Amino acid sequence: MSFRFKALDQRLVLTVAIAIALTACAKKQEPAAEAPAGEKPAAAAPVSDALEGQVDIVAWAGYIERGETDKGYDWVTPFEKDTGCKVNVKIAGTSDEMVSLMTQGGYDLVTASGDASLRLIRGGTVQPIDIARVPSYANVDDRLKEGSWHFVDGKHYGTPYQWGPNVLMYNTNAFKTAPTSWSVVFEEGKLADGKSNKGRTQAYDGPIYIADAAIYLMAKQPELGIKDPYELNEQQYAAVLELLRKQHPLIQRYWHDANVQVQDFTNEGVVVSSSWPFQVNTLQANKQPVASVIPAEGASGWADTTMLAANAKHPNCAYKWMEWSLNAKVQGDVAAWFGSVPAVPAACKGNALLTDTGCATNGFDKFDKIHFWRTPEASCKTQGTCVPYSRWATDFVAVMGGR
C-alpha cells in the first residue's frame, strides 16, 4: 500500500511516544468501576431522555481523538460542544482487556472487535440497541449491518465503527516480488535476499491468530475440510495447532502493539508479518521499504462495533455518541487516522484527510477476501461441535511459550 495522509509524518516522528501519550490521557480520564458484577442489566429504554453529561468509552488507541496528538484529528471536541456530554476514554491494548474492563463495569460503550463481541453478548455484558435511536444506522455499509459478530438472534448489539484486513506486510528489500501465500510466515524458507525467514518473522499474539493458521490450511490441506476458520473440530484444531508449533522457531516476536511492530520493522530486522494497514501506512510515511498484500488464501480481519453496556450509567449520551460516530465526516477522519475502512461508505468521498483514494488503499474492495474475527463457540454451523474460545486462549498461550 502507498496511501499517505496529511498529518501522518507529523505524528509518527516518535511513534512510541504517541502511544504513551494516548495511554496517559486515558488513565487520567478512567472512571471508577460503578456497576457490581452481579447487577441485572438495565432496560434498553431510558427512564429519562435527559443527557447525563458524560460518556465513558473503552476503545482501541487512536479510535477516539480530541486533537491532542494532532490538531487536525479531533472528532471529540465538536461532539462535546454539541451535546454537553464529556467523553472519557480508557484505552485497551487487546480484546481480552476490553472484555475484562467491560465485565468489571463502570463504562458505557466499547469499540469491540469480533473476537470480543460475542463473549460480551453471551455474558450479558452488553445489551441490544434500539436502532431507531440511531438514524444514521441506515447509512451503514450493507455488508456490515447484520454481521454475525454483532447481530445475534435478530437483535443489533451495537453500531459498526471501522473495519479492515489483517494484511501480510513485507520488506521490499527481502522480497523482490510480492509474496502470494502466507507460507512465508508459517514455513521456514530462504527469502529473495538470500537469508532465512527464521527470526525475522512475527505473528499476532492473540488467540484469534489461530484462525490465520486455519485460513492457510483451508487452502494448503483441503482434505481437512475446514469451511470456517472460526469453526474447527478436534481434528482440524489439532492440525492448526501443529502448524503454529512448527512456526514458533521462526518468530522474533508475537506482537499486539502496532507501534512496537513499527519499531521492529525499522530497527530489529523483521521483514515479514501479519499486520494492519496502520503499520503499513506508518512505515511508508517514514520512508521504510515495506508493502502489503492479501495472499491467495485470503486473510482474517476485524470489524469493530460500538457496543452499549448492559449497566450503562449514561445511556442517553451513549446513544448520542453512537449516532455521532456514524457521521460521514467522523468516519472518514477515523479511517484516515487509523488506516481503516469506514463503516459508512459515504465517508470514502470528499474527506480531505482520507482523500478519495484512501478507502481503496485501506481495503474497501477486499471485503469478500476477509474472514472477519468472530469468537469461536462450541455450537457452530459448519459441523456438530467446535472447539470453543476458552480452549483457543489456553492453547495459544502454550504455543507462544514453545509448548
Locate the predicted segments by residue.
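Bacterial N-terminal signal peptides
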Residues: V13-T23
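Early extracytoplasmic/lumenal segment of secretory-pathway proteins
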Residues: K40-L120
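Extracytoplasmic/periplasmic substrate-binding proteins
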Residues: L250-N311, A346-N362
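Conserved C-terminal helix/tail region of periplasmic/extracytoplasmic solute-binding proteins
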Residues: K369-R403
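Extracytoplasmic ligand-binding site segments that recognize negatively charged/polar headgroups
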Residues: W60-K71, G106, T111-V260
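Bacterial signal peptide processing site
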Residues: C25-K28
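Bacterial N-terminal signal peptides that target proteins for export
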Residues: S2-V13
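Mature extracytoplasmic/periplasmic domains
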Residues: D304, A309-W373
